[in-house]
Regions:
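Register position in tetratricopeptide repeats
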Residues: 13, 47, 81-82, 115-116, ...
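Structural marker of alpha-solenoid helical repeat scaffolds
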Residues: 30, 63-65, 97-99, 132-133, ...
Length: 218
């Protein structure tokens, strides 16, 4: 049954839902109660927006495998798609309790909190993602967005400096640091940050543009 799983996941990741459905049908004919295939069936129901059918199937799977985090992740996905972000957050916390790999769930929790404009909670989860992986630039951008909404300039500077401590040649962090300094009127520091971004990656056009605009305005 795992071979079928791999084939279905491959098709879904390439956006070929029809071939995924065909492979799933064959798999379930041979292994009708294999929970990995049943979870893929519910995932396809979700893609087709058959949410109620997916929920019933997930409830059935949960009776067989109550400690599978994927069940809660799919329930969270359904709740989010239906606009019920609070329920989605609750399901994600349930998944987090039994997960060995929290990064993805932290990110999802951050995104759900963003959607309800709870920037403090969102920033907590994006910061967790960043602590685990300083190269997680989407989480860095989301964290900086939260701090911007909260007017927490110092927190933004501190987070960027933490990234730079682990990777002093991170052009993205230098570039963002320059933009934060610029917003709070620290022109000299902003210019230095843009220059360090260029030193870190001399093909990074964003830093050249920001530096050029800054020099023009002086």
């Amino acid at each position: 049954p795992q071979e079928f799983e791999e084939i279905i996941v491959h098709y879904l990741s390439h956006g070929d839902k029809q071939l995924a459905k065909r492979a799933l049908k064959m798999g379930l004919q041979q292994h009708p109660s294999f929970h990995g295939l049943l979870l893929l069936q519910s995932e396809i129901y979700i893609l087709d927006e058959n949410y109620e059918v997916a929920i019933k199937l997930l409830e059935y799977i949960e009776k067989l495998n109550p400690f599978d985090e994927e069940i809660s992740l799919q329930r969270a996905n359904i709740a989010s798609k239906k606009g019920d972000h609070i329920s989605s957050i609750n399901y994600l916390h349930k998944a987090l309790k039994i997960s060995d790999d929290p990064d993805e769930i932290w990110n999802l929790l951050g995104m759900e909190h963003l959607l309800v404009e709870n920037y403090i909670e969102a920033s907590y989860f994006f910061k967790n993602c960043l602590s685990n992986n300083p190269d997680d630039y989407p989480s860095l951008y989301n964290l900086l967005y939260c701090y911007e909404q909260l007017n927490m300039t110092e927190a933004a500077i501190n987070s960027l400096n933490e990234v730079l401590e682990s990777d002093p040649y991170c052009e993205v962090a230098w570039h963002q640091l320059g933009k934060v300094y610029l917003k709070c009127g620290k022109i000299k520091e902003a210019l230095s940050a843009f220059e360090f971004a260029i030193i870190s990656d001399d093909r990074f056009t964003g830093a050249y543009i920001e530096k050029g605009k800054l020099l023009e305005s002086l």
